[in-house]
């Protein structure tokens, strides 16, 4: 009986895993659900959240330093982390969103370190993969990769506009095939929030990365810290 019960539980687990991974962002959902089981242990939840946000701060700083290598801008480099920290305090925000953000930063960091010859191919291929792994955060990847090319005067900067099209096609195809319930959840960050509540702050977390990229690129013209005295 115990063996049959174990097999039954294993079958249920496999079905749940399959159903989860069939969703757009299924990997991020699965990881967040896996981590949630440890939240019953005292102080474990805050520690896990802190570790995730620390990784966000590290990866975003590494990406931004590719645009501006100045060492006197640590607070500016932390703006994406700060925006995500604030939204993480909202109970209607799912930790799935932070994990998806981490996947975005990881793939974007890899993108910034790839040689020009294959970077464009990597960008095209990784977009549908990121959509499947992490969901609509793929659009932020496409925008950020495009910004990076223009801000670093990349050789493929104009053709990189196609990233936006591929991200949109991935979302539309995913909705048509049933991986996303509707186009809103395929394109917008509402996919990472309680659908019954409005969490407007999630948009600030998405705006923060490309806006910070623009800011550090602007500050690149100054070799020394900008004087408040002019």
Regions found by a protein language model. Name each.
Residues 15, 19, 34-41, 192-203:
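Short aromatic-rich membrane-water interface segments that cap or initiate transmembrane helices
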Residues 21-39, 51-52:
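Short hydrophobic/aromatic helix or loop-helix immediately within or flanking a transmembrane segment
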Residues 50-68, 106, 110:
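Transmembrane-helix motifs of polytopic, lipid-linked glycan transferases
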Residues 158-223:
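Membrane-embedded alpha-helical segments of integral membrane proteins
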Residues 224-230:
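Internal/C-terminal transmembrane anchor helices
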